[in-house]
Amino acid sequence: MRRDGARRRVYKAEQKQAVYEAFVEHHGSFGRRMLKRILERKSIHLSEYKISKILKELGVSPKYGRKRCKNVHTSKNTEHYIQQNLYAHLTDEEKSRMEVWSMDFTEEKINGKKIYTCGIISVKRKILVGYAQGSRCTTALAMEAFANAMLAHGIPDMVMTDRGSQFVSKDFHAMMEDWGIKHSMSRPYTPVDNRFIETFWKSMKVELGKKDLLNEATYRMVIEYYIFYYNNLRPHSTLGYTPPLAA
């Protein structure tokens, strides 16, 4: 009986180690559901209930808002650039065929200075296709991010944004027309319409945690690493728990 009990305790320790390593590997971001999938890929089969108990015994819990630019812009000079929510009216066949990008800004205060990041994600492929950073939340920064994305991934069929002033502008509208890209805008105060990039920003902020001790250069490096990690290593539930670039 003593030997059997010892074996059970050793096996339990191995389970704890496996769960903890998977938890740490992905920066403490995932809970029992995602950890179960990650462990299964390593031929370790534990129930969600068991994983939940182990996390509790280890005294750890998954992370899981966000500061951002104003997402609704109204001006008599630019209101004619406001677009409808075209994406909501696409058929499933069109969504599966078209390359649609979702883009938006997020901000972080580092050493008392605001740094804005404009990012763009592929709705279908879940790849962060491009981004740009700057000290101001401007149309120019949005256009720089878009140029970076097109350079790396070509021209999309449609772009989704909110109604922020950066997107309700003459220059951004002209860029969409020049490239023949359809522009879909969220309804006012309805971030769910542009949920794809919204979800990415939420995941990034939660998984990176506090950044109190970072300087600007280090923060930019951290963002660069996270985007690499997200595209190449982080499992994505809608892609069968494989990273976007491996799907």
Q: Where are each of the predicted segments found?
A:
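C-terminal domain-tail junction helix/linker
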Residues: 177, 202-247
